Swiss-Prot record:
Primary location class: membrane
Consequence of changing residue 131 to M: Impairs binding of free carboxylate group of substrates
Effect of residue 751 to A: Loss of function
Compartments where found: Membrane; Secreted
Organ and tissue specificity: Specifically expressed in testis and central nervous system (CNS) (at protein level). Restricted to developing and differentiating fields of the CNS. The soluble form is expressed in round spermatides.
Domain Peptidase M13 intervals: 84-774
Bilayer topology annotation: Single-pass type II membrane protein
Residues the UniProt record annotates as site (Cleavage): 72-73
Post-translational modification remark: N-glycosylated.
Protein name: Membrane metallo-endopeptidase-like 1
InterPro entries (UniProt xref): MetalloPept_cat_dom_sf (IPR024079), Peptidase_M13 (IPR000718), Peptidase_M13_C (IPR018497), Peptidase_M13_dom_2 (IPR042089), Peptidase_M13_N (IPR008753)
Species for this entry: Rattus norvegicus
Binding site for Zn(2+): 608, 612, 671
Transmembrane segments: 27-47
Length: 774
């Protein structure tokens, strides 16, 4: 929804101390670097958010005379020995960069292999992972820190933090989880009307009083499962100061709709059906019912048949990019008239959801419908399938979500499905699973522990200064765009200058006298012996905290993500960029490393998020976060034409791991626009910083110019590899291009890159035609 970068000669290489007559200190450092290569900690992060070729618009793709002058100065200054940084931070950074590179590759042929070839050679995907990247490594290291603070019992903390620690201990209490086995799940099944496949005579005992409206409402409000119909509360796209009810098409049991009907996904479907059948059979036996495998298989096949119809009824994500086309506001009467769904009572359904938080529907209540095509198709599906199959499906979606909270035998039932879907053969080690779960559900409490243990508070002000530098470049770059008229440029400038930022963490999580943190989790009462029930509390708390907002004014200062997260975000409804503390660490950012790394790391991230405000989705929202068309017809038309260039460019990248499928340039357009804009803005901001007198430092053992160091650090945050199964899933579902395409596509379009590495026109990294939007 609208809620939610002539080969004049390669660089000089120094293969040994004697060739360049290095000084004693430099030689010593190079020896030290060699020793560090095997042990250097790679701590980077990455954030991961088809058409035919159209004539390209040349949007001032030159490098300005001023930028050329600065680059020449960079090249000149980079040859001086006095600027070599020999601090421990710089030595570690140099070791990391050297280890990740493959200097046998030519940067003008394939810069991704040149920058990341060493990383790809040295890292094997763990059996527990479907993907392994510098982002995953940084997340792993963050989880080690969180494990330490969650297990530390030496200090008594405030109630919110103690609850997080109790939740963690309950997750780690595997002996009790094994002893209780399926008991907690069976108790839940009784609460939600039973699971027909795991009981006898459901049609006679439960069927007569079964109501779809009430079942959907219970799953939504008590278990945070929005099945069949996705009803949720969010900022009104057209009035960002208020909340509104949204109705949309739902998610499915498998990650992508294509898995349900594409021929090449038959193995995944078979494993999914076997997973469903195994779980239902296990529960029947636990209830002392006959296994009746054939009966269970038949009933679950009907569930898969139903879900396949639902998948076909949904609209593919690539056709849902235009939020202005999705948004349809209507009253309850119109909703009922247009989508009767064979007698489905919309007022009853919505009121049952809201009554869980004591909110009453108003006579003139309006809803925003995003999923009109889906709702039009849903009526026939509801008419075809009986109540028993519908109930089997609804309960299955809850069971699927709760499997990870049960004993080991239930996890073993999903092994083949996970192997077919992700390529993984092992479950994640238990403590990591528990750390991730607690951080996801109690992000403010866990974030407070992380900040106290691992975050430098002065990073906030330094990053804020970087944001202003890169925002200024974005505004300056508007003057270079000949596809945009002055009226639209002025509006774009206003929006850019009004982008708000959140950096690191909200202050209240560290303020002992501020009770907001404890109040956030006041309704939760955890027990170390009741992990499954603790999870149900979290589901209910998350659902009801969201539902309560319907009658509340939007809090523009509310943090949309926790502090201990290795990612960054842009919210179009708030015109807000967010940089959690988890990403504000080396090598993305450090006051102790060269500025080339900071601008190529967190600077690129900042530019990426700013540009999201002007991608194919963000551009539909104004400076206040309202969905408003502030574009002239001329500028809007040319934005679409410029976008076609990028769609075509990225659609020509194929992914060998994903059976050589081509990237969907349309689905990935928003992220590609942000990648391109982000690296362009960060590089220009770096050149401006140098032009204004900034003095950078070189890294020992690396004969790289400042500009080359910038681009290598930018590329290396994307180093990573995928299992083939997950690559196939990602190319269907991920809005990001594959990692190598993210690097190659954005740098092919940037003149400053080809100048820094002397790439001749016509070489792979300096194509004859380039795309530019921002």
């Amino acid at each position: 929804m609208g809620k939610s970068e002539s080969s004049v000669g390669m660089m000089e290489r120094a293969d040994n101390c004697g060739r360049r007559r290095l000084g004693f200190v430099e030689c010593g450092l190079l020896v030290l670097l060699t020793l560090l290569l095997m042990g250097a900690i790679v701590t980077l992060g990455v954030f991961y958010s088809i058409g035919k070729q159209l004539p390209l618009l040349n949007s001032l793709l030159h490098v300005s005379r001023h930028e050329r002058t600065v680059v020449k100065r960079v090249l000149r200054d980079s040859s001086q020995k006095s600027d070599i940084c020999t601090t421990p931070s710089c030595v570690i950074a140099a070791a990391r960069i050297l280890q990740n590179m493959d200097q046998s590759k030519k940067p003008c042929d394939n810069f991704y292999q040149y920058a990341c070839g060493g990383w790809l050679r040295h890292h094997v995907i763990p059996e527990t992972n479907s993907r392994y990247s510098v982002f995953d490594i940084l997340r792993d290291e963050l989880e080690v820190i969180l494990k330490g603070v969650l297990e530390d019992s030496s200090v008594q903390h405030r109630p919110a933090v103690e609850k997080a620690k109790t939740l963690y201990r309950s997750c780690m209490n595997q002996s009790v989880i094994e002893k209780r086995d399926s008991e907690p799940l069976l108790n839940v099944l009784d609460m939600i009307g039973g699971w027909p496949v795991a009981m006898d005579k459901w049609n006679e005992t439960m069927g007569p009083k079964w109501e779809l409206e009430r079942q959907l409402a219970v799953l939504n409000s008590q278990f945070n499962r929005r099945v069949l119909i996705d009803l949720f509360i969010w900022n009104d796209d057209q009035n960002s100061s208020r909340h509104v009810i949204y109705i949309d098409q739902p998610t499915l049991g498998m990650p992508s709709r294509e898995y349900y009907f594409k021929e090449d996904s038959h193995r995944v479907r078979e494993a999914y059906l076997q997973f469903m059948t195994s779980v239902a059979t296990m529960l029947r036996r636990d209830l002392n019912l006959p296994g009746e495998t054939d009966l269970v298989q038949e009933e679950m096949a009907q569930v898969l048949h139903l879900e396949t119809h639902l998948a076909n009824a949904t609209v593919p994500q690539e056709k849902r990019h235009d939020v202005t086309a999705l948004y349809h506001r209507m009253g309850l009467e119109e909703l009922q008239e247009r989508f009767g769904l064979k007698g489905f009572n919309w007022t009853l359904f919505i009121q049952n959801v809201l009554s869980s938080v004591q909110v009453e529907l108003l006579p003139n209540e309006e809803v925003v419908v995003y999923g009109i095509p889906y709702l039009e198709n849903l009526e026939e599906i509801i008419d075809v399938f009986p109540a028993q199959t519908l109930q089997n499906y609804l309960v299955w979606r809850l069971v699927l979500d709760r499997i990870g909270s049960l004993s080991q035998r239930f996890k073993e039932a999903r092994v083949d499905y996970r192997k077919a879907l992700y390529g993984t053969t092992m479950e994640e080690v238990r403590w990591r699973e528990c750390v991730s779960y607690v951080n996801s559900n109690m992000e403010s409490a866990v974030g407070s522990l992380y900040i106290k243990r691992a975050f430098s508070k002065d990073s906030k002000s330094i990053v804020s200064e970087l944001i202003e530098k890169i925002r200024s470049v974005f505004v300056d770059n508007l003057d270079e765009l000949n596809w945009m008229d002055e009226e639209s440029k002025k509006k774009a400038q206003e929006k850019a200058l009004n982008i708000r930022e959140q950096i690191g963490y909200p202050d209240y999580i560290l303020e002992d006298n501020n009770r907001h943190l404890d109040e956030e989790y006041s309704s939760l009462t955890f027990s170390e012996d009741l992990y499954f029930e603790n999870g149900l509390q979290n589901l209910k708390n998350n659902a009801q905290r969201s539902l309560k907002k319907l009658r509340e004014k939007v809090d523009q200062n509310l943090w949309i993500i926790g502090a201990a997260v290795v990612n960054a975000f842009y919210s179009p409804n708030r015109n807000l960029i967010v940089f959690p503390a988890g990403i504000l660490q080396p090598p993305f950012f450090s006051k102790d490393q060269p500025q080339a790394l900071n601008f190529g790391g967190i600077g690129m991230v900042i530019g990426h998020e700013i540009t999201h405000g002007f991608d194919d989705n963000g551009r539909n929202f104004d400076k206040n976060g309202n969905m408003l068309d502030w574009w002239s017809n001329f500028s809007a038309r040319h934005f679409r034409q410029q976008s076609q260039c990028m769609i075509y460019q990225y659609s020509n990248f194929s992914w060998e791991l994903a059976d050589n499928q081509n990237v969907n340039g349309f689905s990935t357009l928003g992220e590609n626009i942000a990648d391109n804009g982000g690296v362009r803005q960060a590089y220009k901001a770096y050149l401006q910083w140098l032009a204004e007198g900034g003095r950078d430092q070189r890294l020992p053992g690396l004969n790289l110019t400042y500009a080359q160091l910038f681009f290598i650090n930018y590329a290396q945050v994307w180093c990573g590899s995928y299992r083939p199964e997950f690559a196939i899933q990602s190319i269907k579902t991920d809005v990001h291009s594959p990692l190598n395409a993210q690097v190659l596509g954005s740098l092919q379009n940037l003149p400053g890159f080809s100048e820094a590495f002397h790439c001749p026109r016509g070489s792979p990294m300096h194509p004859m035609n380039r795309c530019r939007i921002w």
